[in-house]
């Protein structure tokens, strides 16, 4: 048989099977590289209480950092990283309710703070305004983070009126500096908690304030980091919170037949949301429940959208929380609002709290 007549033989190449585990590993690496890195920094006594509580309840995908001038308090706090600022200045004894000492302590430890914030995409800074460390150091930390190109959102409480005029003056000083150095400052007026629950014992009132801080930070963080029914993209959050000034928060919940609409109404009419929201530039809606229906989510979003500026950017997400059972909870963060707690002319830094102009943090009479 000649070569030309030889039968043709098909040479079969064995198929190369790529193990599924290798593909999954590669996908995991890609997801790890692209996911948003979110840091939560608790500053001072109240801020450290907040991050301590966050460590207890758990926050998916966030690095928790505790910062204080008081070594004894810092020792008790749970966090992924702890930073004692101003070691030379305060010797670990605290700031003595003096924001200037808190500010200088943060500046002394600027390199350590900068190293701790390296690599973040978004930084939450939480504190209670009115004391020394949180009031003085939080704006310095915000400035560091923002200069590093990180989306910087401060979540702060204002003191109860019963805490005295000095803490109110300190809070004025700290708030205007935070607005200057943060992309967004979410303000929670503690006095407004008395409208929500006027008969609360004082110790419980402070715990409720801490819990609202935790809900705000955890809620926004996990809409980005935690798998849910509807997640938010980090770029969506950036669009609503970048360079937005003052923001306020409202929370509502209901388990009635009209639970979705009632929860949305409660959130927008919450005493904590103490502003006219009609001119707001943005809104972030966090919906949570065990069995949220798409129709209910639509009712909530439409209700909020109708009540803000027609040009406002509205983003939303849904987290499934089995422990809520039949309850729907709605948290709304309204950004770019005009607040009675701070006005544009207050944004120039003051030399000391005592030299601040006579601008009252006006709390409506209860």
Curated annotation (Swiss-Prot):
Localization per Swiss-Prot or TrEMBL: Cytoplasm
Biased composition (Low complexity): 355-366
Region (Disordered) location: 344-366
A GO term from the CC aspect: cytoplasm
Biased composition (Acidic residues): 344-354
InterPro entries membership: Cell_div_FtsZ, Cell_div_FtsZ_CS, FtsZ/CetZ, FtsZ_C, Tub_FtsZ_C, Tubulin/FtsZ-like_C, Tubulin/FtsZ_2-layer-sand-dom, Tubulin/FtsZ_GTPase_sf
Transmembrane segments: none
GO biological process, one term: protein polymerization
Keywords tagged on the record: Cell cycle, Cell division, Cytoplasm, GTP-binding, Nucleotide-binding, Septation
Signal peptide segment: none
Binding site for GTP: 45-49, 132-134, 163, 167, 210
Family recorded in the similarity comment: Belongs to the FtsZ family.
Function: Essential cell division protein that forms a contractile ring structure (Z ring) at the future cell division site. The regulation of the ring assembly controls the timing and the location of cell division. One of the functions of the FtsZ ring is to recruit other cell division proteins to the septum to produce a new cell wall between the dividing cells. Binds GTP and shows GTPase activity.
HAMAP family reported in the protein's UniProt record: FtsZ
Quaternary structure annotation from Swiss-Prot or TrEMBL: Homodimer. Polymerizes to form a dynamic ring structure in a strictly GTP-dependent manner. Interacts directly with several other division proteins.
UniProt name for this protein: Cell division protein FtsZ 1
Phylogenetic lineage: Archaea, Methanobacteriati, Methanobacteriota, Thermococci, Thermococcales
């Amino acid at each position: 048989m000649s070569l030309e007549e030889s039968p043709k033989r098909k040479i079969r190449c064995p198929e190369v099977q790529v193990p599924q585990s290798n593909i999954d590993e590669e996908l995991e690496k890609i997801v790890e590289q692209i996911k948003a890195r979110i840091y939560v920094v608790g500053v001072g006594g109240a801020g450290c209480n907040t991050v301590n509580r966050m460590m207890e309840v758990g926050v998916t995908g966030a690095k928790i950092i505790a910062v204080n001038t008081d070594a004894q308090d810092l020792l008790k706090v749970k966090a992924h990283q702890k930073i004692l600022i101003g070691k030379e200045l305060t010797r670990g004894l605290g700031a003595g309710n003096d924001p200037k000492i808190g500010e200088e302590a943060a500046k002394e430890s600027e390199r350590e703070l900068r190293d701790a914030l390296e690599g973040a995409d978004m930084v939450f800074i939480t504190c209670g305004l009115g004391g020394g460390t949180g009031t003085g150091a939080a704006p310095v930390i915000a400035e560091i983070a923002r200069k590093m190109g990180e989306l910087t959102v401060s979540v702060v409480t204002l003191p109860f009126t019963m805490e005295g005029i000095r803490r109110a003056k300190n809070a004025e000083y700290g708030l205007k500096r935070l607005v200057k150095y943060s992309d967004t400052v979410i303000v929670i007026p503690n006095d407004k908690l008395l409208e929500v629950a006027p008969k609360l014992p004082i110790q419980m009132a402070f715990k409720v304030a801490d819990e609202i801080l935790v809900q705000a930070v955890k809620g926004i963080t996990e809409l980005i980091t935690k798998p849910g029914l509807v997640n938010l993209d980090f770029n969506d959050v950036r669009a609503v919170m970048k360079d937005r000034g003052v923001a306020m928060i409202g929370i509502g919940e209901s388990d009635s037949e009209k639970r979705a609409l009632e929860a949305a109404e409660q959130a927008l009419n919450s005493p904590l949301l103490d502003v006219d929201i009609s001119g707001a530039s943005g809104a972030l809606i966090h919906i949570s429940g065990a069995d949220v229906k798409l129709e209910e989510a639509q009712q909530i979003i439409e209700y909020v959208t109708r009540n803000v500026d027609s040009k406002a950017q509205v983003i939303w997400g849904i987290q499934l929380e089995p422990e809520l059972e039949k309850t729907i909870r709605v948290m709304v963060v309204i950004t770019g609002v005009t607040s009675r707690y701070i006005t544009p002319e207050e944004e120039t830094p003051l030399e000391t709290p005592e030299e601040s102009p006579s601008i009252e943090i006006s709390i409506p009479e209860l």
